Swiss-Prot record:
Residues 403-427 have a biased composition (Basic and acidic residues). GTP binds at residues 584-589, 603-608, 701, 749-750. It comes from Arabidopsis thaliana (Mouse-ear cress). Mg(2+) binds at residue 588. It comes from the Eukaryota. GO terms for cellular component: chloroplast outer membrane; plastid. Keywords: Acetylation, Chloroplast, Coiled coil, Cytoplasm, GTP-binding, Hydrolase, Magnesium, Membrane, Metal-binding, Nucleotide-binding, Phosphoprotein, Plastid, Plastid outer membrane, Protein transport, Receptor, Transmembrane, Transmembrane helix, Transport. Gene3D superfamilies: P-loop containing nucleotide triphosphate hydrolases (3.40.50.300). Induction: By light conditions. The lineage of its organism: Eukaryota, Viridiplantae, Streptophyta, Embryophyta, Tracheophyta. Residues 13-33 form a coiled coil. Residues 581-588 are annotated as: G1. GO terms for biological process: protein targeting to chloroplast; protein transport. The modification Phosphoserine is found at residues 195, 337, 363, 398. This is Translocase of chloroplast 132, chloroplastic.
Length: 1206
């Protein structure tokens, strides 16, 4: 705006011309208005009489027409209005009533327009509002709109009923029918016109001819009644058409521009400077008393009113310095026409959330403010509503003097569509609803207020918070306690939030200053990430999830640059870093590099740090304290020493804990195994897993050359760093028990020959200056910790909720191992073989078989030459006889062996009953000569095509030592020349000559894996046919060791049936599994037997169930007869997944020297295998079968597509 103020006044000649132009168009709607003329006559008379008559009840008619409003500072608003009524205004009212009647009958248009303005730049009150004057209307209504601030004083007409708005059609403003005759007024939704049945807010009338200025609250002058006339006639103008409004504005624009300047000057000459000062001071005090800004759209929706939008048309005067805003009632048609002409302009700025709207009834009870907020620049929107309390009463008084105009002239205040006032609650943030419950019930079809076309919705940040419902007032008195409590809680929360935001802003400034000192810009990746996290934390902590304004970063960056440029404000920041790591990785050298001076002596051949010590210094003006610790050792055997060192470190930092932990390791240390896990777990056990939450991984020797890749080419430096970082980060996650950890990694190079830049800073091969980056990471971690403590955010780390997920134990594997049948250990004299249980079945036939072999005639074997002379039939008979005799001989030998075992068993029992001395003599006599070690035969090795196939191998000896040590042959191992990949050792111990203990172990090692197996077993007999065994197994399962303790009891419940029951407990990793099994073996005969077993295994609430069935059918003379068939069935249920598998294996003799072996297996998932094998010692032509795969391979070379089945 300019410094001057313009008023545009329309002459009577123009008024008549406009009225004549509109007569022809108004005849169209004349018939519709005739129906409501009689009703409107009565209502308008009542409104005018109430508006003027209510003031006469308290005070006589004003006698002094020249009294000004400045003398009524302490009087109510009603008294001020009375004193301001002069005789020429009364006469003008009568003339206005007559003009209104004429206009109503002739459908006349708008009369004069008076503009009042307020200048914010030169100390004069300027209001860029062009209001219509309504001649003859005795209802009062006023409204003002400006770019910055419009304030309006309201007159209250007391009635006992609540104010309501009447919408004749239940539609929007453009469709309402309003008639004004005989000085009576009908109100409709959103136009602000008073209803004669209720208390209404009416605006004082300013006559157009006299030019007398009558200031209202805060120096605001009330517009003429033309505004109300224009608002009432909106419906008529819409029905008449769009042209009327356009013609009206076109005809009056030039004259308004010309006449505006003089009228404005005349009006403001009569307004004293004191009133201007009073008005501005009142506005300032109202703002300071905690007013609340109400959004027009949301208020209209809550009150259920239909508001009329007022569009401001900007008119520039001849000098070009001032702007006059013409306020007209805008219907949808008028909005479109004004948009086409391009007449609607404006300057709408965003309203800050701190700007609230309310009145302070105790300090300044006579003032009210009107604020407007528009979501679209260039257009000022205004919606008029009757504003009242719940019972329809207002206590509005005239303003008091205030002398603070100069402080408010430069501020910009938006125009708010709500007129709010509160007369009994001091600094009340809520705004009283403008619609009473009676109005809501009487007008259920009310629509939301229509906004002018082109106006967008305001920013969500500028919308006020939802207000608490208010209780109805009785006789003008509200529930003061309830409002006061709500105000106190809201104010306290707002103050706390503002204080937190300020502190967080200071943290931002501090971090930006740190980055500036380290030579890092705000666009650095680490800086940007920290600022993003701070903003995100503030948003999560803020009220109602409101987002942080973008100005926070800009303001913080500018403040940081100013403080660093001035160099007067010291930086209140210090950081303590504790360095941990293995011995020799460069901890002390890194500390020396950080301070750029020798703080600790280092030696490449001796251990540098032997005790915990700290050092302080300044780095770029920042106070840094570093704690150096002795080197740690990674092996398992050194963990006890590491615990002593770490406990001393823990005691040292007890009083002053570090802010950051820097764990150092070497970049060029290639280790993909878990060699560092013992050390990391020890650190976690001593300090707790939380030590890794603020840890930074530093990799020294960062200028190392990357190793060669798999194909011999050099790998990239970035890939080398990434792989090494991933290994260390993964190990730390496992040691901390939190797989979410992602510790940042920083590279370090302490060598004096490291490449440097122009500033003398050491640069890594990837171009990074490592020292500022390391310090920035350390400072960022502390800054985030400070913000976390300020915002009181939870870390969600109570103990170890995210413990490392250990692998679930393989329950099916453990259960199948449990179900396997194991032989029980026996004493040396009882090592008779596995067929002891069959001795009883064969005793009945021993006598017959013995006599059968002895009764055979003598038989003489033939030589090869003699057999060559025999015919084919003779040769067959000879071979059959030979085979029969051999079978009978083998049977006889087996019988003799069984008899010998029985005799030896009886003899051993008799020796135990004899005296000890006699038994020793018997053993000495029966003992033979000392055994001589003999070479053991070599194990068969697979064929090898290597040229260095050894012809000589050192053999092991069979000695008399009780330890049996043998090599372990692996036919498919990597060392196919030797085939020995492990060693096996066995020994049998006897405790008290009754309890056998068997110990066996095996170690297998190749280039990658190492497997260990250890088995210890013992058995005790406690009755005939009853025994109990106890065993301990240790074996490698994956990369962990599984320890199993098992026990089994066997007993013979029938002569041909044996039962067994067993338990097992397995410890694997950090899980314990327990299992139970039951087994039954039934021997039907020498040729058929069946074994059934079932069991269950559980761990961590998980269960696995399984069972096996094995049936064996063999030759009656087995093992002399080679026929054998085995049928197996297994069932496993784990996690509801049922696995069923079956297998069959059969061996059938074909002729005298050939066997056919067939195998087949199938499971319930459709997977299976079938194999057939034939071996023979005579039919060598079977080797021709090998031609088949060779022929197929040759075909694949000529027809490659056959290889893929195409």
């Amino acid at each position: 705006m300019g410094d001057g103020t313009e008023f545009v006044v329309r002459s009577d000649r123009e008024d008549k011309k406009l009225a004549e132009d509109r007569i022809s168009d108004e005849q169209v709607v004349k018939n519709e208005l005739v129906r409501s003329d009689e009703v409107r006559d009565d209502n308008e008379d009542e409104v005018f009489e109430e508006a003027i008559g209510s003031e006469n009840d308290e005070q006589e008619e004003e006698e002094d027409p020249k009294r000004e409003l400045f003398e009524s500072d302490d009087l109510p608003l009603v008294e001020t209005l009375k004193s301001s009524m002069v005789e020429h205004e009364v006469e003008d009212f009568e003339e206005a009533v007559g003009d209104l009647d004429e206009t109503s009958s002739n459908e006349g248009g708008v009369k004069d327009f008076t503009a009042v303005g307020e200048s914010h730049g030169a100390g004069e009150a300027e209001f860029d509002v062009l209001a219509t004057k309504m001649n003859g209307d005795k209802g009062e209504g006023g409204g003002g709109g400006s770019y910055d601030k419009v304030e309006s004083s309201l007159d209250v007409v007391d009635t006992t009923e609540n104010a309501t708005s009447t919408n004749t059609n239940g539609s929007n403003l453009a469709a309402e029918h309003v008639g004004i005759e005989n000085g009576k007024t009908h109100s409709f939704l959103g136009n602000g016109i008073a209803s004669p049945k209720n208390k209404e807010v009416v605006a004082e009338v300013i006559p157009k001819d006299d030019g007398i200025e009558e200031p209202w609250n805060d120096g605001i002058e009330v517009d003429n009644w033309e505004e109300r006339v224009d608002g009432i006639q909106t419906e008529q103008e819409v029905e008449e058409g769009e042209g009327t409004t356009e013609n009206q504005f076109e005809k009056r624009t030039e004259e308004e521009v010309v006449e505006g300047e003089g009228t404005s000057k005349n009006l403001f000459e009569k307004q004293t400077e004191q009133d201007v000062v009073e008005g501005e001071g009142t506005s300032k005090d109202l703002f300071e008393n905690g007013s609340v800004c109400m959004d027009s759209e949301s208020e209209a929706e809550r009150n259920g009113e239909t508001g009329a939008a007022y569009t401001s048309n900007i008119v520039t005067n001849a000098s070009g310095d001032n702007e006059v805003s013409s306020a007209v009632t805008s219907s949808p048609l008028e909005e479109s026409s004004s948009g086409e002409k391009g007449e609607t302009e404006g300057d709408s700025t965003c309203l800050k959330p701190e700007q609230h709207l309310a009145s302070s009834p105790h300090s300044y009870p006579e003032s009210t403010e009107v604020h407007s907020n528009s979501g679209s620049p260039g257009v000022t929107s205004r919606e008029h509503k009757p504003v009242q309390s719940a019972n329809g009463g207002h206590d509005v008084q005239s303003p008091q003097p205030n002398k603070e105009l100069e402080k408010q002239q430069s501020s910009r205040v938006h125009v708010d569509p709500e007129i709010t006032e509160n007369s009994h609650v001091e600094t009340e943030p809520e705004v009283v609803s403008s619609v009473s419950p009676t109005e809501s019930r009487s007008n259920p079809a009310a629509l939301p207020p229509a906004r002018p076309a082109g106006l967008g919705r305001a920013s969500p940040l500028l919308e006020p918070a939802s207000r608490a419902p208010q209780q109805s007032r009785v006789n003008g008195n509200g529930s003061h306690n309830q409002f006061q409590q709500a105000e106190d809680s809201t104010t306290t929360e707002a103050d706390e939030h503002d204080e937190t935001r300020e502190k967080l802003q200071l943290i931002r400034v501090k971090f930006l200053r740190l980055a500036h000192r380290l030579g890092q810009t705000p666009h650095n990746v680490v800086v940007a990430q920290v600022l993003y996290r701070l903003g995100l934390a503030e948003q999560l902590r803020g009220r109602n999830g409101s987002r942080v304004g973008a100005f926070s970063f800009d303001r913080a960056s500018a403040m940081a640059e100013q403080l660093e440029a001035a160099g007067q404000d010291p930086l209140d920041f210090s950081c303590t870093i504790m360095v941990l790591g293995k011995s020799g990785v460069g901890k002390s050298a890194t500390i020396n590099s950080i301070f750029d001076e020798v703080k600790f002596c280092t030696d490449a051949f001796q251990m540098g740090t032997k005790r915990v010590q700290d050092v302080e210094g300044l780095v770029q003006g920042i106070k840094v304290r570093v704690i150096d610790t002795p080197g740690l050792l990674p092996s398992w055997s050194d963990q006890a020493k590491n615990e002593k060192i770490l406990n001393s470190v823990k005691a040292f930092i007890k009083k002053n804990p570090p802010d950051i932990v820097l764990y150092l390791d070497r970049l060029d240390m290639q280790s993909r195994d878990s060699g560092d896990m013992p050390l990391l777990r020890t650190i976690s056990d001593v300090f707790g897993p939380s030590i890794w939450f603020n840890a930074i991984v530093g990799l020294t020797h960062a200028a190392s050359v990357p190793p060669d890749g798999p194909n011999g080419t050099a790998s990239s430096y970035d890939m080398f760093v990434t792989q090494r970082s991933h290994v260390i980060q993964q190990a730390i996650r496992q040691a901390a028990g939190d797989m979410r950890l992602m510790n940042p990694v920083s590279l370090v190079e302490n060598h004096s020959a490291c490449r440097t830049n122009r500033a003398g800073q050491r640069v890594l091969p990837n171009g990074q200056v490592w020292k500022p980056h390391l310090l920035l990471l350390s400072f960022a971690s502390k800054i985030l910790a400070e913000a976390n403590a300020l915002l009181k955010l939870q870390d969600n780390i109570p103990g170890r909720p995210f413990a490392a997920r250990s692998k679930a134990p393989p329950l099916p594997f453990l259960l199948s191992s449990l179900l396997q049948s194991r032989p029980q250990p026996k004493l040396p004299e009882q090592q008779y073989g596995d067929e002891e249980d069959e001795d009883d079945l064969e005793e009945s036939s021993d006598s017959d078989e013995e006599s059968e072999y002895d009764q055979l005639p003598p038989f003489k074997s033939l030589t090869k030459a003699q057999m060559a002379t025999l015919s084919k039939s003779q040769k067959k008979q000879y071979l059959d006889e030979m085979e029969y005799r051999e079978k009978l001989l083998m049977k006889k030998q087996m019988k003799e062996e069984r008899k010998r075992r029985k005799m030896f068993k009886k003899f051993a029992a008799e020796i135990k009953d004899l005296p000890d001395g006699y038994s020793e003599n018997v053993e000495e006599e029966s003992g033979g000569p000392a055994s001589v070690p003999v070479p053991m035969p070599d194990l068969s090795l697979p064929a090898s095509f290597d040229s260095d196939n050894p012809t000589h191998r050192y053999r092991y000896l069979d000695s008399s030592n009780q330890w049996l040590v043998r090599p372990v042959l692996e036919t498919h191992g990597w060392d196919h020349d030797i085939g020995y990949e492990g060693v096996n050792a066995e020994r049998l111990f006897v405790v008290k000559e009754k309890i056998p203990i068997s110990v066996s172990g095996q170690v297998t090692k190749d280039k990658k894996d190492a497997n260990v197996q250890l088995e210890m077993a013992s058995s005790v007999k406690h009755g005939e046919g009853k025994s109990t065994s106890l065993g301990f197994d240790m074996q490698t399962v994956g990369k962990e060791l599984a320890y199993t303790l098992r026990s089994e009891t066997r007993f013979n419940n029938f002569r041909r049936n044996k039962a067994a029951a067993g338990l097992s407990v397995t410890h694997l990793g950090d899980s314990v599994s327990a299992g139970l099994k039951v087994e039954d073996k039934f021997i039907a005969s020498k040729w058929f037997r069946i074994v059934m077993s079932g069991g269950a295994m559980t761990s961590r609430g998980d269960f696995a169930y399984g069972g096996t069935l094995e049936a064996q059918l063999r030759d009656k003379d087995y093992p002399l007869g080679r026929f054998l068939t085995t049928l197996g069935l297994s069932v496993m249920d784990w996690h509801g997944d049922l696995a069923i598998g079956g297998n069959i294996q059969s061996q059938v003799p074909i002729g005298r020297s050939s066997n056919l072996i067939a195998r087949a297996n199938l499971n319930n998932r459709g997977a299976g295998q079938v194999s057939v094998r034939v071996n023979s010692s005579e039919q060598l032509q079977l080797a021709m079968v090998a031609i088949v795969p060779l022929f197929k391979k040759l075909l694949s070379y000529y027809y490659p597509q056959t290889q893929y089945g195409q």
